[in-house]
Swiss-Prot record:
InterPro entries: GreA/GreB_C_sf, TF_GreA/GreB_CS, Tscrpt_elong_fac_GreA, Tscrpt_elong_fac_GreA/B, Tscrpt_elong_fac_GreA/B_C, Tscrpt_elong_fac_GreA/B_fam, Tscrpt_elong_fac_GreA/B_N, Tscrpt_elong_fac_GreA/B_N_sf
GO MF term (any one): RNA polymerase binding
Entry keywords, A to Z: Coiled coil, DNA-binding, Transcription, Transcription regulation
Keyword Metal-binding in record: no
Similarity remark: Belongs to the GreA/GreB family.
Protein name as catalogued: Transcription elongation factor GreA
Function field: Necessary for efficient RNA polymerase transcription elongation past template-encoded arresting sites. The arresting sites in DNA have the property of trapping a certain fraction of elongating RNA polymerases that pass through, resulting in locked ternary complexes. Cleavage of the nascent transcript by cleavage factors such as GreA or GreB allows the resumption of elongation from the new 3'terminus. GreA releases sequences of 2 to 3 nucleotides.
SS bond partners: none
Entries under PANTHER family matching the protein: TRANSCRIPTION ELONGATION FACTOR GREA
Coiled-coil ranges (or none): 3-37
Top-rank lineage group of the source organism: Bacteria
């Protein structure tokens, strides 16, 4: 099921997806084909768990390859030259002050494909990302969360 939804990526995100695709096509495909071949050598495949496992992994790999190719085909790469430092946009690194806890946090605003909250990479589609996009230094933005509202003051915007 192909989709033509635009996939917003940073250059770093594009490289990561291309590397994953290359690894799946060259290394993982070969490995799983070898495992299938080996499992077939055991004879009867009707009760061959190694064969079933390898075929399931093959299906996953082929599905992921299809997904990655589709994402790359529809990729819109954010050019670092287009990232402004006066307004928050995708590709911005934003230092904010969490006004409730008086803590500074730096977020990297990325497309949803690259989001990784554990690395402070937040999606432009997330509640915090949506609130920050378009903000300027000194702005106070509010994010509605299940427990109420969080306020952030934008301290710094950089590439």
């Amino acid at each position: 099921m192909a989709t033509n939804k635009e996939v917003v990526l940073t250059y770093e995100g594009l490289q990561k997806l291309e590397q994953e695709l290359e690894n799946l096509k060259t290394v993982k495909r070969r490995e799983v084909a070898e495992r299938i071949k080996q499992a077939l050598s055991f004879g009867d495949i009707s009760e061959n768990s190694e064969y079933d496992e390898a075929k399931n992994e093959q299906a996953y790999i082929e599905g992921r390859i299809f997904q990655l190719e589709n994402m790359l085909k529809n990729a819109k790469v954010i050019d670092e030259e287009d990232i402004q430092t006066d307004v928050v946009s995708i590709g911005s690194k934003v230092k904010v002050l969490d006004m409730e806890f008086d803590e500074e946090v730096e977020y990297y605003i990325v497309g949803s494909t690259e989001a990784d909250p554990s690395q402070y990479k937040i999606s432009n589609e997330s509640p915090v990302g949506k609130a920050l996009i378009g903000g300027k230094i000194g702005d106070i933005v509010e994010v509605t969360v299940p427990d109420g509202v969080i306020k952030f003051k934008i301290l710094e915007i950089r590439k």
